[in-house]
């Protein structure tokens, strides 16, 4: 059954999987589906072994007997989307038009720490509506609408992704609109849904812009992806150009959705490999370049180097990424911001323990993000999946800064609908 499923996935007209923003089946969806299949097949084998001789057994495969999982795969494939999870999508049909598929995600969490001045709080996570529409065999639409609250308890609505997609073949696919920049691995493998990821939150270096993140997580422009031909290494390329991140004042909206603050454009180039002989393994590198123009500082040349090595197979998750931001101030100095994280987890039935160590060090004299300074520490926790639709997570963390150290816990219920 798994061989048939994998063949169907590979036969679909996409230009790669989750690492290619907005194209094809989401890589995390496939891993979750295959993991669930393995678990169900194991349960069926145990039941067959325990059944008395002569007792009839059901011949259908466990994947086919699980309508939630099989429906998710069918819905995702027909929509040409990249972030559907292992649950049914909701179809909205209008006579004469292609059906629109809607998938929902959200979470509720609680956090407490011993940091002075920090208050333990319950909090609403992002309410995420993932929308896809297939216009033809080669054309599709993808939207991601998020409702969330900020630190001032104000609820707002933001269009996190909006893409018009053209897929010529496995070697070329082009998206136009607002996308998740393909810097490293995590940003295009895990989108706006905590349910998809093992831990409660994202790694420190991949925090969203409105949450204090230093990377240009979102961009508005063009993104091209595809597979390189004649390669047993499973090589894929990424080429993106967009407005880049706003930099004039800290109060500006970080994502330049409508107007660019200058005529220069941000460019991101990347390449990654998924060797055929090592299922679940991926390694890659990307280079991002932009010019920033903060008031009172002058032009800053920004270069972001990112590399990753990940392995996800048979319930094992091993993620490793290193990133260096280089800021060259015109007529001034050059500053480097190193950051990395390493995360490992292992699924054992419905339980997945995980551990992550993360690090970021912003120089004291760095002109843009010196308020962040040095931050590093471990995060360890446990994820328990109630079923294919809901999960509970409990994690403990230690946050170490230059002059402050704190300990705390986070707990979360995340779900898809």
Residue ranges and their predicted role:
Residues 4-13:
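Sec-dependent N-terminal signal peptides
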Residues 18-110, 417:
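N-terminal periplasmic/intermembrane-space "pro-region" immediately following the signal or transit peptide
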Residues 86, 112-113, 202-209, 251-255, ...:
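Extracytoplasmic loops and strand-loop junctions of Gram-negative outer membrane beta-barrel proteins
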Residues 89-247, 263-268, 272-278, 343-354, ...:
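Outer membrane beta-barrel
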Residues 116, 154, 162-167, 175-178, ...:
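Outer-membrane beta-barrel pore domains
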Residues 240, 244-258, 288-294:
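Active-site-proximal beta-alpha loop/turn segments in soluble metabolic enzymes
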Residues 256-264, 300:
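Interfacial loop-to-helix transition and helix-capping segments at the boundaries
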């Amino acid at each position: 059954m798994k061989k048939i499923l994998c063949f169907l996935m590979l036969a679909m007209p996409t230009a790669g999987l989750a690492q290619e923003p907005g194209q094809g089946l989401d890589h995390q969806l496939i891993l979750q589906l295959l993991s669930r299949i393995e678990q169900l097949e194991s349960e069926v084998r145990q039941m067959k072994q325990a059944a008395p001789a002569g007792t009839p057994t059901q011949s259908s495969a466990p994947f086919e007997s699980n309508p939630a999982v099989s429906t998710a795969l069918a819905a995702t494939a027909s929509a040409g989307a990249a972030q559907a999870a292992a649950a049914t999508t909701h179809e909205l049909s209008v006579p004469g038009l292609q059906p629109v598929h809607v998938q929902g995600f959200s979470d509720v969490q609680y956090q407490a720490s011993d940091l002075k001045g920090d208050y333990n709080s319950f909090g609403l996570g992002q309410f995420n509506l993932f929308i896809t529409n297939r216009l033809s065999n080669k054309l599709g639409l993808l939207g991601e609408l998020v409702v969330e609250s900020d630190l001032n308890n104000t609820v707002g609505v933001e269009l996190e992704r909006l893409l018009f997609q053209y897929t010529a073949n496995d070697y070329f696919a082009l998206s136009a609109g607002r996308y998740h920049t393909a810097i490293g691995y995590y940003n295009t493998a895990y989108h706006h849904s905590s349910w998809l990821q093992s831990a409660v939150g994202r790694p420190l270096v991949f925090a969203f812009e409105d949450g204090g993140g230093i990377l240009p997580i979102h961009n508005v422009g063009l993104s091209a992806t595809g597979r390189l031909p004649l390669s047993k290494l499973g090589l894929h390329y990424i080429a993106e150009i967009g407005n880049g991140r706003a930099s004039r004042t800290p109060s500006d909206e970080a994502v330049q959705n409508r107007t660019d603050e200058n005529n220069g454009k941000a460019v991101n180039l990347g390449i990654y490999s998924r060797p055929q002989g090592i299922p679940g393994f991926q390694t890659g590198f990307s280079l991002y370049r932009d010019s920033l123009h903060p008031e009172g500082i002058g032009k800053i040349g920004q270069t972001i180097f990112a590399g990753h090595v990940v392995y996800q197979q048979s319930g094992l998750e091993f993620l490793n990424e290193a990133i260096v931001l280089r800021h060259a101030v015109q007529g001034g100095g050059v500053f480097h911001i190193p950051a990395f994280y390493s995360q490992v987890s292992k699924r054992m039935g419905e339980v997945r323990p995980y551990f992550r160590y993360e690090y970021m060090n912003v120089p004291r004299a760095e002109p843009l993000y010196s308020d962040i300074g040095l931050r590093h520490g471990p995060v360890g926790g446990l994820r328990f999946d109630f079923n294919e639709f809901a999960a509970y997570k409990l994690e403990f963390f230690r946050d170490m800064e230059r002059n402050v150290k704190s300990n705390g816990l986070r707990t979360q219920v995340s779900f898809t609908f």
